[in-house]
């Protein structure tokens, strides 16, 4: 049987699946890797003074992982730089925040090349290689240059940008050309697949063939739409676990007969958090009778704190949450509970079940599994309501929610 090799920036295989703290994607990939006796390869999250190329092989709850340390310069140029200051804002239609530094691009190319050089000796002839996300776009090209002829697939977890925006990226053609060393490229939605096709055909003079096939740069690649889901049974088990039930009871008691609105988002300018809080402020201003009757629980773990734009959004959100609470709170009621911390999966399931409204209102987002987890957590006899941005990947195939424009205040 062929092995599965997963390649991603960070290895998210849980050390203890029973703990319930891992995300749904990590749990699903770990299950597939256990089934196919696979390997999960990526950055360890650690830095070293000098690149060694040493790979540490570990077992995490039955999943074999291969971990590589990076130099501090690699982290600064490849991860904080090109991945998160250049590609991330561009792919989320924020070219005003995108930073184009030559050293960032050089670091991105260098780290992908180094990863390929370390991974190549571990690959067996029948292995299937599955590369994940924008950090690793050139990976197939670098593996092919080392003589790897295995099947290699790529899945993009973010949106793909419109052609008119992508061309603002220096060497955009080189980036897209490197993707034609994959055999299969997957997207969450038809929209993003179509945008990729539009670039290839209109900008690079490529041609369509068959169903989802593209020919360009002297090579052929197959594209497909594969909207990621959640493990519903696993999430229900988390909701019904001891901690999940205890969290639900705790939140129900804490609400004190008030209706809870919940938002759970990593701190990121793409999530529409400022617009969400401003909309909630407008809602309280326009609906005085609802003051004291509802509250917003906004769970927002800090991320990418080394990037200036993330420091800026954090400061603005801190100030905005404080302003709203200062303006509307009473001695026994606080309109916003704003928390910069993480919670375990079973705790989140309990929180979702207790919330009467779930807010998932990004300005531009990948699939956003919070939307699906919120729905899965509901009591089918008395479900809450999901308000979902039209610009989340989860909005494309659904009919179970209220779609909204995240830039329009709640009314």
Regions found by a protein language model. Give the residues of each.
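N-terminal low-complexity, Ser/Thr- and acidic-residue-enriched intrinsically disordered segments
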Residues: 1-73
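Conserved nucleotide-sugar donor-binding subdomain of glycosyltransferases
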Residues: 75-128, 243-250, 254-256, 337-346
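Nucleotide-sugar donor-binding and catalytic loop/hinge architecture
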Residues: 213-222, 237-261, 288-291
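Conserved donor-binding/catalytic core segment of Leloir-type glycosyltransferases
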Residues: 255-270, 296-297
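A conserved mid-protein helix/loop that constitutes part of the nucleotide-sugar donor-binding site
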Residues: 268-284
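Nucleotide-activated donor-binding/catalytic signature segment of Leloir-type glycosyltransferases, i.e.
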Residues: 300-346
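Acidic donor-binding loop of glycosyltransferase active sites
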Residues: 349-366, 375-376, 381-383, 391-393
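Conserved small/polar residues in nucleotide/adenosyl-binding loops
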Residues: 401-407
């Amino acid at each position: 049987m062929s092995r599965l090799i997963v390649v991603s920036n960070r290895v998210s295989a849980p050390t203890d699946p029973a703990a319930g703290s891992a995300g749904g994607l990590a749990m699903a990939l770990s299950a597939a890797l256990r089934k196919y006796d696979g390997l999960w390869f990526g950055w360890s999250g650690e830095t070293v003074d000098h690149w060694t190329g040493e790979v540490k092989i570990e077992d995490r709850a039955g999943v074999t992982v291969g971990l590589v340390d990076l130099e501090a310069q690699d982290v600064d140029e490849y991860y904080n730089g090109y991945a998160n200051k250049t590609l991330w804002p561009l792919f989320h239609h924020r070219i005003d925040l995108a930073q184009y530094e030559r050293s960032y691009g050089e670091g991105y190319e260098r780290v992908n090349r180094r990863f390929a050089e370390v991974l190549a000796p571990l690959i067996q002839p029948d292995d299937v290689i599955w590369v994940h996300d924008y950090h690793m776009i050139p990976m197939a090209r670098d593996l092919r240059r080392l003589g790897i002829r295995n099947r290699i697939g790529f899945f993009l977890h973010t949106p793909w940008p419109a052609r008119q925006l992508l061309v603002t990226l220096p060497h955009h053609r080189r980036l897209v050309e490197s993707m034609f060393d994959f055999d299969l490229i997957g997207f969450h939605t038809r929209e993003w697949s179509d945008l990729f096709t539009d670039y290839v055909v209109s900008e690079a003079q490529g041609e369509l063939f068959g169903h989802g096939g593209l020919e360009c740069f002297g090579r052929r690649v197959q594209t497909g739409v594969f909207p990621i889901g959640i493990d519903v049974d696993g999430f229900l088990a988390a909701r019904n676990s001891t901690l999940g039930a205890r969290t639900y009871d705790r939140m129900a008691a804490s609400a004190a007969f008030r209706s809870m609105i919940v938002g759970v988002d990593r701190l990121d300018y793409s999530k529409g958090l400022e617009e969400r809080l401003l909309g909630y402020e407008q809602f309280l201003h326009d609906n005085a009778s609802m003051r004291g009757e509802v509250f917003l629980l906004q769970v927002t773990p800090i991320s990418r704190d080394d990037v200036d734009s993330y420091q800026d959004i954090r400061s603005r959100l801190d100030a905005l949450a404080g302003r709203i609470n200062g303006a509307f709170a009473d001695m026994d009621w606080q309109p916003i509970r704003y928390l910069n911390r993480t919670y375990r999966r079973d705790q989140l399931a309990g929180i979702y079940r207790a919330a009467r409204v779930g807010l998932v209102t990004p300005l531009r987002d990948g699939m956003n599994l919070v939307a699906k987890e919120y729905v899965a957590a509901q009591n089918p006899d008395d479900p809450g309501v999901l308000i979902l941005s039209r610009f989340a990947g989860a909005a494309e195939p659904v009919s179970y929610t209220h779609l909204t424009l995240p830039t329009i205040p709640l009314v």
